[in-house]
C-alpha cells in the first residue's frame, strides 16, 4: 500500500522533527505510514484487526492488536502519534488508556480530519496536556502538546449495556450501535423465524445483538461471530455470556480467519471506513461467502437500499431476493446452489 491518508500526509510535512523520536502510533491508522516512518524507533497499538494485518508486514511484533494497550506496548516510547477516529468515545478510551502509561513530559501529537471532530482533542486532554494546533492542511488538523499529568484508566468503567426483548446487550466505545439496536439490524432480525437451525456465522458482529436475538428464539443454532474490531469482539463475548449463550467469537477481517462452511451467514456490513464510504468489506463478504456456505446454505444481509449489492449477488450467486425493505434499507437473501461462482 503506497497511498497515504490526508492525516498521514500532514504528518509527513513534519517528518524531519521526528528523526530522534521513539514513537508509539495508535488510533485510526488507515495506512502503513507507521511502518515506514523514519524515526529512532517505532511501535504501534491498534484495536482494528485489518490495521494490524497491514502494519505487521513491516513492523512484525512491534505492532499489537488488542482492546487495551499494555505497558509493553508503550515500552520506552517518548512520543505518541494518535490518529483521531470518527468516534469520540473511542478516542477517549484509547487516549486515556495510552496516556496512563506514557511518561510525563512525552510529546503528544493528535492528527485527524476536521470533519471527524479532531478539534475536540484539545478539551478532552485539557486536564492532562495543553494541545496547540501546529498545522492545518488537506482538511486535517495536527495538534501538539506535552503530557503534564497521567490520567487514570479503568477499562471496566467504559462498559455500557441496553436491554432488548429480555436480552442484555453489552457494549464498548467504538462498537456499532452502542446505544441501541439500529434500524438496519432490526429489519434483518424481523426476517428470521423461530426454530432456525444449523451453523450460523455472524460477520461484523458488533455487540453480538444479531446472534443473541437469533439464539434466543432458535436455541439449536450454533453460533460463530467475527469482527475486525477488538471492542466488538469483547462486547460480543460479553453479550453472549450475559445471556447464557454459547458461541465462538474471534477477530477476523471478513473471512480472513474463518474456516469451515456454514448453513447461514448473516451480516449488517459496514459501508463507512473512517469517514469515507467503502463497499470493500461488503464486496469481500459477498464474493467470499461461496467458500464458506454449505450446499443450500444462505447469505442474508441488510444494506442501505442505494448500495449496488443486487448486481453483485446476481453475479456471484445467480439470483437474489428481497425479504424486507423500508425507504432506507433492504434485506437481501441468496442461496448457495450449483450455479454459484466458487
Curated annotation (Swiss-Prot):
Q: Does the keyword Methyltransferase apply?
A: yes
Its domain of life reads Bacteria
Keywords for this entry? Cytoplasm, Methyltransferase, rRNA processing, S-adenosyl-L-methionine, Transferase
Any one of the GO CC terms:
cytoplasm
Q: Which Gene3D superfamilies match?
A: Vaccinia Virus protein VP39 (3.40.50.150)
Q: Does the keyword S-adenosyl-L-methionine apply?
A: yes
Where it mainly occurs, coarsely classed, is cytoplasm
Pfam families, per this entry? MTS, MTS_N
E.C. numbers: 2.1.1.172
Looking up CDD domains in the UniProt record yields:
AdoMet_MTases
- What NCBIfam families has UniProt attached to this entry? PRK09489.1
Q: Summarize the protein's role.
A: Specifically methylates the guanine in position 1207 of 16S rRNA in the 30S particle.
Q: Which PANTHER family match?
A: RIBOSOMAL RNA SMALL SUBUNIT METHYLTRANSFERASE C
This protein's name: Ribosomal RNA small subunit methyltransferase C
Q: Gene encoding this polypeptide?
A: rsmC
Amino acid at each position: 500500500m503506497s497511498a497515504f491518508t490526508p492525516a498521514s500526509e500532514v504528518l509527513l510535512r513534519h517528518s524531519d522533527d521526528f528523526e530522534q523520536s521513539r514513537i508509539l502510533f495508535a488510533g485510526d491508522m488507515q495506512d502503513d505510514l507507521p511502518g515506514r516512518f523514519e524515526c529512532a524507533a517505532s511501535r504501534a497499538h491498534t484495536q482494528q484487526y485489518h490495521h494490524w494485518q497491514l502494519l505487521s508486514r513491516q513492523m512484525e511484533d512491534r505492532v499489537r492488536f488488542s482492546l487495551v494497550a499494555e505497558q509493553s506496548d508503550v515500552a520506552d516510547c517518548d512520543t505518541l502519534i494518535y490518529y483521531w477516529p470518527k468516534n469520540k468515545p473511542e478516542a477517549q478510551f484509547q487516549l486515556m488508556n495510552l496516556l496512563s502509561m506514557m511518561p510525563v513530559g512525552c510529546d503528544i501529537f493528535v492528527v485527524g480530519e476536521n470533519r471527524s471532530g479532531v478539534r475536540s482533542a484539545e478539551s478532552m486532554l485539557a486536564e492532562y496536556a495543553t494541545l496547540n494546533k501546529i498545522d492545518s492542511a488537506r482538511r486535517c488538523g495536527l495538534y501538539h502538546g506535552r503530557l503534564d499529568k497521567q490520567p487514570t484508566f479503568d477499562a471496566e468503567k467504559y462498559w455500557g449495556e441496553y436491554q432488548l426483548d429480555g436480552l442484555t446487550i453489552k457494549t464498548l466505545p467504538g462498537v456499532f450501535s452502542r446505544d441501541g439496536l439500529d434500524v438496519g439490524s432490526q429489519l434483518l432480525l424481523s426476517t428470521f423465524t423461530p426454530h432456525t437451525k444449523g451453523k450460523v456465522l455472524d460477520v461484523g458482529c458488533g455487540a453480538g445483538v444479531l446472534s443473541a436475538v437469533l439464539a434466543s428464539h432458535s436455541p439449536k443454532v450454533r453460533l460463530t461471530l467475527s469482527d475486525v474490531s477488538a471492542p466488538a469482539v469483547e462486547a460480543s463475548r460479553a453479550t453472549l455470556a450475559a445471556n447464557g449463550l454459547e458461541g465462538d467469537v474471534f477477530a477476523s477481517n471478513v473471512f480472513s480467519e474463518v474456516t469451515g462452511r456454514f448453513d447461514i451467514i448473516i451480516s449488517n456490513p459496514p459501508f463507512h471506513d473512517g469517514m469515507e464510504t467503502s463497499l470493500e468489506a461488503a464486496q469481500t463478504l459477498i464474493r467470499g461467502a461461496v467458500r464458506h456456505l454449505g450446499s443450500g446454505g444462505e447469505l442474508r444481509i441488510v444494506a442501505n437500499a442505494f448500495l449496488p449489492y443486487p448486481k453483485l449477488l446476481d453475479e456471484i450467486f445467480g439470483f437474489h431476493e428481497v425479504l424486507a425493505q423500508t425507504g432506507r434499507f433492504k434485506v437481501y437473501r441468496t442461496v448457495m446452489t450449483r450455479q454459484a461462482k466458487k
